């Protein structure tokens, strides 16, 4: 075949990403596949040409040589006008993963048997206390999960025996069905696509190759986690099948509410009730933190609902050395009733409220505070 530019063959730009090149090749392979174009030498030539182009452009090293030197840079790989594949069967064998996924045709690299399958992911819902979330903790989880059967090592066959190759599909897990011009590969009904048959099942797992077990895992809870955060433990999910990798375990966090603190992002909110005398005259009050209590200055004239911010007394930011703040939300307590002496002082304050020196008003509230037992 003529040596056209490989990018032109696949219809992609020279800066095309790998997945774009793969998609373009799939499209060309579908268009010029021999089963779709029987007795068509031109389509077969284009099919081989697309395969040749894809074999170079999918490989980073080959692609770099081609970009620099053109066809001369990759002719040592067997290309050079005649194509790198002597037959369509060679192409099927070389790119069996693509054709198996895309077309389902038989004759793509021989009997490969069942493919490895990754194990399923697991989810574990973990409730932790507010303090555990704030400070971090190490907890032990008991996870019910399937594990590879220790008696048969996952084969499903009784100890001392081995699974047999399926006689119907020859171990490929597929059988061929002719549909018009197409040969479609279907899962073998005799072995259910496994490519093998267990004549003598393992007594322990009953041929499943897996048994259920309780696995204890030690998990570190980072400080600052919140409800909905997920911790991913790689490889701690269900075991893979046919040599596939295990799945992952996702620990989903739920943080219990706290009686003292309310969370606002990485800040903590705490309510502090003060008397109306403290609000007017100002005072020093003690408020709780996650550590020891701290003293907060309440300035004169503080209104109910005002918030005072104490930096560094909140929750740590995940993955950072920064820490949130403690937000002290003040609530001014108003007495529901007063005695005669208190009412007298309040009436006197009402008369003196305007156009009186502040010192006299301050003394008035000191008297009111003593009368109400707030000294």
Curated annotation (Swiss-Prot):
A Gene Ontology cellular-component term: cytoplasm
> So where does Zn(2+) 1 get bound?
149, 152, 202, 205
ZnF locations on chain (CR-type): 136-214
Q: Which cofactor does it need?
A: Zn(2+)
Extract the Pfam families matched here: DnaJ, DnaJ_C, DnaJ_CXXCXGXG
Binding of Zn(2+) 2, residues: 166, 169, 188, 191
- Give the UniProt keywords, A-Z: Chaperone, Cytoplasm, DNA replication, Metal-binding, Repeat, Stress response, Zinc, Zinc-finger
Q: Where in the cell is it found?
A: Cytoplasm
Q: What is its main location?
A: cytoplasm
Task: Tell me the InterPro entries matching this sequence.
Answer: DnaJ, DnaJ_C, DnaJ_domain, DnaJ_domain_CS, HSP40/DnaJ_pept-bd, HSP_DnaJ_Cys-rich_dom, HSP_DnaJ_Cys-rich_dom_sf, J_dom_sf
PROSITE patterns the record matches: DNAJ_1, DNAJ_2, ZF_CR
- Gene3D superfamilies from the entry? DnaJ domain, Heat shock protein DnaJ, cysteine-rich domain, Urease metallochaperone UreE, N-terminal domain
Extent of the CXXCXGXG motif repeats = 149-156, 166-173, 188-195, 202-209
Q: Which residues form the J domain?
A: 5-70
Molecular function, one GO term: heat shock protein binding
A GO biological-process term: DNA replication
Could you give the cofactor binding note from the entry? Binds 2 Zn(2+) ions per monomer.
Task: Tell whether Ligase is among the UniProt keywords.
Answer: no
Job of this protein: Participates actively in the response to hyperosmotic and heat shock by preventing the aggregation of stress-denatured proteins and by disaggregating proteins, also in an autonomous, DnaK-independent fashion. Unfolded proteins bind initially to DnaJ; upon interaction with the DnaJ-bound protein, DnaK hydrolyzes its bound ATP, resulting in the formation of a stable complex. GrpE releases ADP from DnaK; ATP binding to DnaK triggers the release of the substrate protein, thus completing the reaction cycle.
Which NCBIfam families does the protein's record reference? DnaJ_bact, PRK10767.1, PRK14301.1
Family per record: Belongs to the DnaJ family.
What's noted about domains in the record? The J domain is necessary and sufficient to stimulate DnaK ATPase activity. Zinc center 1 plays an important role in the autonomous, DnaK-independent chaperone activity of DnaJ. Zinc center 2 is essential for interaction with DnaK and for DnaJ activity.
**Record's subunit section:** Homodimer.
- The name this protein carries in UniProt is Chaperone protein DnaJ
Organism in which the protein naturally occurs: Oleidesulfovibrio alaskensis (strain ATCC BAA-1058 / DSM 17464 / G20)
């Amino acid at each position: 075949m003529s040596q056209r530019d490989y990018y032109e063959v696949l219809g992609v730009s020279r800066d095309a990403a790998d997945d774009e090149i793969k998609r373009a090749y799939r499209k060309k392979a579908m268009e010029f596949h021999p089963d779709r174009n029987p007795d068509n030498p031109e389509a077969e030539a284009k099919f081989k040409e697309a395969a040749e182009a894809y074999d170079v452009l999918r490989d980073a090293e080959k692609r770099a040589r081609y970009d620099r030197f053109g066809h001369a840079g990759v002719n040592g790989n067997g290309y050079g006008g005649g194509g790198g594949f002597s037959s369509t069967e060679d192409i099927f064998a070389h790119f069996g993963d693509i054709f198996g996924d895309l077309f389902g045709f038989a004759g793509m690299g021989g009997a490969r048997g069942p493919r490895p399958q990754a194990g399923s992911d697991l989810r574990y819902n973990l409730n932790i206390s507010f303090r555990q979330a704030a400070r971090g903790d190490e907890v032990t989880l008991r996870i019910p999960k399937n594990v590879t059967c220790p008696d048969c090592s996952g084969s499903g066959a009784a100890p001392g025996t081995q699974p047999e190759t399926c006689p119907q599909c020859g171990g490929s897990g597929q059988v061929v069905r002719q549909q018009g011009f197409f040969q479609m590969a279907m899962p073998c009904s005799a072995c259910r696509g496994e490519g093998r048959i267990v004549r003598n099942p393992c007594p322990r797992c009953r041929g499943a190759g897996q048994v259920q077990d309780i696995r204890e895992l030690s998990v570190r809870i980072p400080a600052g986690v919140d409800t909905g955060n997920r911790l991913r433990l790689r490889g701690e999910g269900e075991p893979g099948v046919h040599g596939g990798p295990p799945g992952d375990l996702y620990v989903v966090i739920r943080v219990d509410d706290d009686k003292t603190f309310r969370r606002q992002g990485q800040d903590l909110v705490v309510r502090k009730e003060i008397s109306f005398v403290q609000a007017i005259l100002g005072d020093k009050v003690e408020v709780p933190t996650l550590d020891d209590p701290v003293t907060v200055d309440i300035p004169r004239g503080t209104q109910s609902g005002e918030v005072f911010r104490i930096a560094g007394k909140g929750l740590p930011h995940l993955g950072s050395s920064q820490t949130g703040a403690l937000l002290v939300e003040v609530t001014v307590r108003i007495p529901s009733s007063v005695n005669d002496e208190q009412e007298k002082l309040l009436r006197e304050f009402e008369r003196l409220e305007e156009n009186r020196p502040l010192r006299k008003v301050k003394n008035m509230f000191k008297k009111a505070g003593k009368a109400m037992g707030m000294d």
